[in-house]
Amino acid sequence: MPHTIKKMSLIGLILMIFTSVFGFANSPSAYYLMGYSAIPFYIFSALLFFIPFALMMAEMGAAYRKEEGGIYSWMNNSVGPRFAFIGTFMWFSSYIIWMVSTSAKVWVPFSTFLYGSDMTQHWRIAGLEPTQVVGLLAVAWMILVTVVASKGINKIARITAVGGIAVMCLNLVLLLVSITILLLNGGHFAQDINFLASPNPGYQSGLAMLSFVVFAIFAYGGIEAVGGLVDKTENPEKNFAKGIVFAAIVISIGYSLAIFLWGVSTNWQQVLSNGSVNLGNITYVLMKSLGMTLGNALHLSPEASLSLGVWFARITGLSMFLAYTGAFFTLCYSPLKAIIQGTPKALWPEPMTRLNAMGMPSIAMWMQCGLVTVFILLVSFGGGTASAFFNKLTLMANVSMTLPYLFLALAFPFFKARQDLDRPFVIFKTHLSAMIATVVVVLVVTFANVFTIIQPVVEAGDWDSTLWMIGGPVFFSLLAMAIYQNYCSRVAKNPQWAVE
């Protein structure tokens, strides 16, 4: 008799989706870029991207629940191996860009924890500019993570848990402190409520506002992993759709509420119009403002209010540093494992698929470390201020993260056309509904990326930013095609490799 695995309840599923998708740092970024006008964009992205895409992934995950290759298997069985590999490689490469971005950003919370504010823009060593110093620290961080992770990731599981709990507590702090400030200030908001216009001078045009959609989509990132939870859920034919829709509503409300609450304590013009504020430190700037506003509402002295704000920023810095650390150790290994161990072995040179004594693909991990290091040095020594550096990396990560969604969405109609699959969970019962969902998701993701990429050129003639945003995804797409073509050539000469 087979061993019975305990299934997840509906509540457990909802919590799992919430923890996987919801990120504390997303609402501060949204408030900085768009103010209250970010809220309609977050709701729009949930309705036209998050919910339909999650349901599509749920269907594919249920039908391919016995496959070990994750999204590679889904696309391979639906469309074909070449399409699947390029799509999966883009998914993997988005995490390469994420590592390039985050290895630099991780020093912002560390600096905030030590000094009470972001001092990374003032770090100068041996004649190097701050951007270059942060770049070298990012390289050191990447090497350290690879050394530790290649010996097994079990040691950092506790840090990941602590970081996750700390960030969840930050959401609670934002809610309770904001309510307290509202009560003490007689319901007065620091920011005037306006859902139609952004207070940010850089986000006044229609083109710039449309490009913000990519930030909203990024906030819902990671939903492709939800499909893998179908077989672990009680009564998936009923509970899975309920769980996804309910979680999506809660997450949508949660993001919108968080953006709304930032306006309780922070006036955009007074606090965020400063040139030193950027997407890398906005979370800590807002948390410091939250603490200072609480101090003022409690009629503390200016010095005490400032001190309270600094401690809010420091606690946030520590929490975010722990969260980044846990995420970094996990994500430097998990996507690489999928692309190396989920795809045919003949795709890769033999050493890359070799596992060390700890069961880790250490050679591939060091090759990944080298690639990330090259990107870090290229960006950090390419000129520009620290503020532009962080903003550029964030945009690169957003574009790269959302491109793999196109591959998964485009594979969905092919998946629906197959007649030989056991489908325990079906939400799109007609060909028309499946096509509508596919078209809507593809259009939303495509337009978001196109608008984001062309906006710097159209508004400021800034070809540099546009080329950086395009460069990462294009490079990895070409690399994927080259790797797959090499695989085809090797299999043609040695057909037995195709079945390995």
Swiss-Prot record:
Q: What Pfam families does this protein's entry cite?
A: AA_permease_2
- The residues on the Cytoplasmic side of the membrane are 1-7, 59-82, 154-163, 231-243, 341-369, 416-433, 484-500
GO function term, MF aspect, one:
amino acid transmembrane transporter activity
Topological domains (Periplasmic): residue ranges?
Answer: 29-37, 104-132, 185-209, 265-319, 391-394, 455-462
According to its UniProt entry, one GO biological process term is:
amino acid transport
Intrachain disulfide bonds: none
Q: Which UniProt key words apply to this protein?
A: Cell inner membrane, Cell membrane, Membrane, Transmembrane, Transmembrane helix, Transport
Q: Where in the cell is it found?
A: Cell inner membrane
Record InterPro entries: AA/rel_permease1, APC_superfamily
Q: Please indicate if the UniProt record lists Transport as a keyword.
A: yes
Membrane-topology annotation of the record: Multi-pass membrane protein
Locate the transmembrane regions by residue number: 8-28, 38-58, 83-103, 133-153, 164-184, 210-230, 244-264, 320-340, 370-390, 395-415, 434-454, 463-483
Q: Name one GO cellular component term.
A: plasma membrane
Q: What is its main location?
A: membrane
- Family per UniProt? Belongs to the amino acid-polyamine-organocation (APC) superfamily.
From the Swiss-Prot or TrEMBL record, give the protein name: Inner membrane transporter YjeM
